[in-house]
Structure formats: C-alpha cells, structure tokens
Swiss-Prot record:
Subcellular location: Cytoplasm
Pfam family for this entry, one: tRNA-synt_2b
Protein name in UniProt: Proline--tRNA ligase
Enzyme nomenclature, EC number: 6.1.1.15
Subunit and interaction comment: Homodimer.
Catalytic activity field: tRNA(Pro) + L-proline + ATP = L-prolyl-tRNA(Pro) + AMP + diphosphate
Biological source species: Cereibacter sphaeroides (strain ATCC 17025 / ATH 2.4.3) (Rhodobacter sphaeroides)
Length: 445
C-alpha cells in the first residue's frame, strides 16, 4: 500500500478524552474514531490490525478441532426467558421491541442461541463431542464506557461452546480451550496468564480468566512469579489427547494465579516472599465449564447408547478480539507510539523514501515494494512529499516492526537501512538482503 493513496488520519496532539496509552495511540494513529460513548468506527489501519488478530484466533480454533459458524447479533428474548437469564442480566443488556411488538435483544453473549441450534439438530450421543464457535459483534450497555476499545459498549468477540456427553469429556474440552488460548496469545506477542476467577452472570463451576499484566488493568491480580517464566513455544499439541492437554493445563495452573474475586490470602502467603507478586491485569479471555446449566432448562439432550435421554454438558469460551488490540498496545509501546509484535502488525514493513522525486530513490523504493510484495509481505510505502522527520514520526507512531529507509547517498553506495522498531537498531545492507531478511523473519511467525 502506498501511503499517498491510503486513508491514515493521524493526529499530532494527544486527544484530551484518552486516559490510557492504548486509547491515545489508537486515536492518534488513525485506527479508530469514536461515534458515541463506547462505540467506534474502525478506520483502515485499525481494521487491518483487527483482522490480523481475528485471523490468528480462527487459525488456532480450527487447529484445536473447533467448527466455525455465525450467529446473528439480534436474538429473540424468548430464548433468554427459557434459560432464566432475561430478567437476571440487568441493564447491560440492550432490549429491543420490533415493529410486531416482539421482544428482542442485542446479544451480549450466545449461550441460549447456540443451545437452541444444538437441540434443533443433534439428537444422538454419536454426534458428540462437538464444539462450535463464532466471531461476532456484541453489545453490553456499560454504565461508564471508558479506555477506548478496552471497555467499550460494542466489541468484537470470539465465543465458542462445547457439547459433551459427560463431565470428563467436558473437562477435556475445557483443557483443550485453555491450551488453544495459550498458543493464541503467545502468537500475538502477549503473555496472558490463566487465573482462577469468578463465573459472573454466565455461571458455572469452573472458570479461568486470561489476563495480561498492565498497570491500566481493571482487575487486581495475585500470582506466583514462577508462572511468568512459562512459555508455550512452538510445541505441537495433539488436541485429542486428554493426557497431553491435561498436562499442559496442570503446568500453567499449578503456580498460584488468581484475581481479587477468588484470591486466598493464606495460600498466597505460603508462597516464598521473593516470588509473591501483586499487579493489575487486563482480561482478554475467559473459559467456563457450566455443566447442564443451560441444556437442562432448554431441553438440549441426546440419546445415549442404552437409550436414555440425558442433558449434555456444556462450556463456553470467549476471547475479546477487539479488546486484544488495546491490550497489545498497552503491553508494547514507547513514548513515540505503538510497537506491533510481528504476528499482528497491520503491515509487515514501512518503506521511507527520504527524497521523493529523486529518480534513484524512487526507482529503488518501487523495486523494494515490488520485491517485498512478491515474497508475500505487505509493505506500507511512504511516498508522500513530506520532510523526513514527519515520515519517521508517522512510522514510529503506527509502530510497524520494521522500517526500510532509502536515501540518495545510500543508494549510491548500494545500501538501504533496515531498522527494528522495538530495539531501534539499524543496519545497512543491500535491498535484496533486506528483503530476504524480512522474508525469513516472517516465515517463522
């Protein structure tokens, strides 16, 4: 993409309404525009980053054997009355009456609808286990939306639902989701810690939240520092193996890690003092096992091998896709702007032409643009007639992991400059070497 033809409405000044880093930089980098309290338009750069995050979520869900579908944003209220949650959910749920005086709602979550789909089409234990998921916009009418996409009213969320014959199978689904989430967050450059948490309005007997440590987090968290040394890495997981998934979950849940809602001071104080940590965390996902809480009242049952009809065991598993953009920026930035991890960057590399209109630099930049694209990379070429300082400031603000700088003196010597946004380190090399280096880096992501 050529910046002269792109829509990137960057701001030079910090917006007064932005209280935290991610909100400030997302507005300044032209990623989002507020349309109402807690409701945002996603501008091209933000939308591109959002789709990168969503793609990783899809890839890891499918890797774990989960099946995508798409449910509507509007739901009939009668489904929620069946489960008993329509009156319990509170004012966060946006209730709507259509022209035929039917009660509807803008879904804050989808347990009822997915249970209705299941009971309409699945009748036998032979069709289990089954996990369905979708990525869809949700709405919760927060009383005080703030912090940009971190606590908005409308948000993009992945929510998945497992249906299993018995407790043991449902716990395997729970473990499978935890493993899948650990891999998902690490691919995004995040260390998200699974912490035992409270179930809230969704309910259930077992739940973990995934939290990214950050001073701007809404939750107080208590944890054993040993958990921050754990890395998922590039291990290959057999998601069908109960033993393997259980072992990974045990590894990640043995060190103490809890939110303030489930914190146990006595257990925490038994940890050696040098490993006890208190911080704040941003919730980026949560998994639940809730047994037959929804299947029983809504009649989601299957016939077993001996002819008995039993309610299925269920769980739900959510990732805040749009919220992840804010969490990534909170965890990865400096005073100049965003620093995108390579796995989620909207563009792979920025090209800065120091002397637009100079035939040698123009030709070199065009060749770089063409060669990078041929390698499957997406460059953002700043071909604007702007001073070099303004171009560098824009690149630092939007935070692409790599920048190639092309100037007349370098071209005369057969060199370009490749700069790492995170470290600030620069290296001169030929254009071909820069292209090969970047292709190698991104091939491993």
């Amino acid at each position: 993409m050529r910046l002269s033809r792109y829509f990137l409405p960057v701001l030079k000044e910090n917006p007064s309404e932005a209280q935290i880093v991610s909100h400030r930089f997302m507005l300044r980098a032209g990623m989002i525009k507020q349309q109402a309290a807690g409701i945002y338009s996603w501008l091209p750069l933000g939308f591109k980053a959002l789709k990168r995050v969503e793609q990783i979520v899809h890839e890891e869900q499918i890797r774990a054997g989960h099946i995508p579908l798409l449910m509507p944003t509007l739901q009939p209220a009668d489904l929620w009355r069946e489960s008993g949650r329509y009156d319990d959910y509170g004012e966060e749920m946006l209730r709507i009456t259509d022209r035929h005086k039917r009660d509807m709602l803008y879904g804050p979550t989808n347990e009822e609808m997915i249970t209705d789909i299941f009971r309409s089409h699945v009748n036998s234990y032979k069709d289990l286990p089954l996990t369905l998921y979708h990525v869809q916009w949700k709405f919760r009418d927060e009383i005080r939306p703030r912090f940009g996409v971190m606590r908005g009213r409308e948000f993009l969320m992945k929510d998945g639902y497992n249906f299993d014959l018995d407790f043991d199978s449902a716990i395997h689904a729970y473990n499978r989701h935890m493993v899948s989430y650990l891999r998902t967050y690490e691919r995004m450059g995040l260390q998200a810690i699974p912490m035992r948490a409270a179930s809230g309005p969704i309910g259930g007997d077992n739940t973990h939240e995934f939290l990214v440590l950050a001073s701007t987090g809404e939750s107080e968290v208590f944890y054993d520092a040993a958990i921050t040394d754990l890395k998922f890495g590039d291990r290959v997981v057999d998601y069908d193996s109960r033993e393997e998934c259980e072992a990974i979950v045990k590894e990640w849940t043995t060190p103490y890690a809890r939110t303030d809602e489930t914190h146990d001071e006595a257990i925490f104080n038994a940890i050696p003092e040098e490993r006890r940590r208190t911080s704040r965390g941003i919730e980026v996902g949560q998994i639940f096992y809730f047994g037959t809480k929804y299947s029983e009242p809504m009649g989601a049952t299957v016939v077993t091998a001996d002819g008995a009809r039993v309610p299925v065991h269920m769980g739900s598993h959510g990732i805040g896709v749009s919220r992840l953009l804010g969490a990534i920026i909170e965890a990865s930035h400096d005073d100049k702007g965003i620093i995108w991890p390579e796995g989620v960057t909207p563009f792979h590399v920025g090209i800065v032409n120091l002397k637009q209109g100079d035939s040698s630099t123009d030709l070199a930049c065009e060749a770089l643009y063409r060669d990078l694209s041929a390698k499957g990379l997406e460059p953002l070429y700043d071909d604007r007639d702007e001073r070099a300082g303004a171009k560098f400031a824009t690149m630092d603000l939007i935070g692409l992991p790599w920048r190639i700088t092309v100037g007349p003196r370098g071209i005369a010597a057969g060199k370009v400059e490749l700069t790492n946004r995170r470290t600030g380190e620069s290296e001169e090399m030929s254009s071909g070497a820069a292209v090969d280096r970047l292709a190698q880096i991104y091939a491993g992501i």
